[in-house]
Amino acid sequence: VTVSVLARTRARQWPLATAAAACLLSFIAFWVAQRLAHVNMLDVMVYRAEGETVRAGGDLYAMRATSANLAMTYPPFAGLLFVPLTFVGVPLMRTLATAGNLLLVVALVQLSLQLVRPSLSGTRLWRAALLVAAVVVWCEPVWTTLRYGQINLLIAVAVLWDFTRREGHRWAGVGIGLATAVKLTPGLFVVFLVIAGVLQWRRERRWNQWLRTAATATAVFLGTTLASALVLPYDSKRFWTETLFETGRVGFAEETANQSLRGVLARLMHTDDPGLWWLVVAVLFGAAAMALAVRAALRGDKALAVVVCAITALMVSPISWSHHWVWCVPLLVLLVDRRDRVRPRWTVGAVALVFASFALWWVPHDPGRPELDQNAGQMLLSGVYPLTIAALFVGYALTRRPQAVAKE
């Protein structure tokens, strides 16, 4: 269904009002489904507790919130951003968080379409965005993001906003800088921008869009981080010297929800710490994937470069919860747009099915940590996102190689 809607959106001339109505009906059904599922929006409750701790002048990184005893894992700047959540009651906060995330789904799709097909604009762009949003809201990463009240959609939108600005735009880089100040992982985009920018500078010997965006992102990140240090000096010192290196406070590596290479290896090796094996695999994969992203950027394929960089961050991060994978939305948009070049032809549908299937939750998962004793079939299901990406990368390499030989 997802692939069908994405593929035909451009051809079918739906009136904008009809597309908006379809999206609204889907979102209402989604809202009702989440209420019937009794979602607890656990993470937004943690965000609220972090904001309350900042207002009370407490210790951010000693704080524990909710019945799950969850700790603060983001930089101090995030705590400052969460203060406004304390100005409204919990029921209203949950409603606003859900409504805001639904709007961000539309924004994410709209920016993904702009990134992949810059010529799409005006009514055609918004019609497509609304129709696609009506479908992708039901995929597992988006569902889980709204279930917990997470900020993944906001992070992705901030990053994509930068990459869809026209060349030379003065504010390009602000989104990446702010996103990195909140969650650190988007900092890989800065690394990508610097590498691509330096290589292009060596070729042309002039300042370019990649370096400009990297400089802006770095300045925004440093500015917000320093400002946070002035407001929260103790918390800032503790985070950057201690908490940053305490990966265990985020969660167990082997958890089914951890859809990173480290999670796959932890379950494969029946351990909570895959150690050096993960580091080697992450470095090798990260280097190869970043080389692909930079190469795509230098030949003008910004969409492929951005999507590959985002996926790389998810793969090599120590913990990438399934709800972090909202980047499946621009990935699917890219695959559908280039479906004529994807082999085998059923690949696009298979990838869409992976993210819509909730397959990773089909295996035993509970506080007793059954993931440490998975069988082969359970390992395949619980590693479905990273394994799908690995298959896509291998398939891309195999299909590109014959093309390169043919050109020679």
Model-derived segments and their meaning:
Residues 170-194, 309-316:
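Membrane-interface alpha helices of multi-pass inner-membrane proteins
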Residues 165, 190, 194-197, 201, ...:
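Solvent-exposed, amphipathic alpha-helical segments
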Residues 322-336:
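Hydrophobic/aromatic-rich transmembrane helices and adjacent perimembrane loops
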Residues 173-176, 237-241, 326-330, 344-350, ...:
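A cytosolic-side transmembrane-helix exit/cap motif
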Residues 159-162, 185, 246-248, 332-338:
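Alpha-helical transmembrane segments and their membrane-interface exit regions
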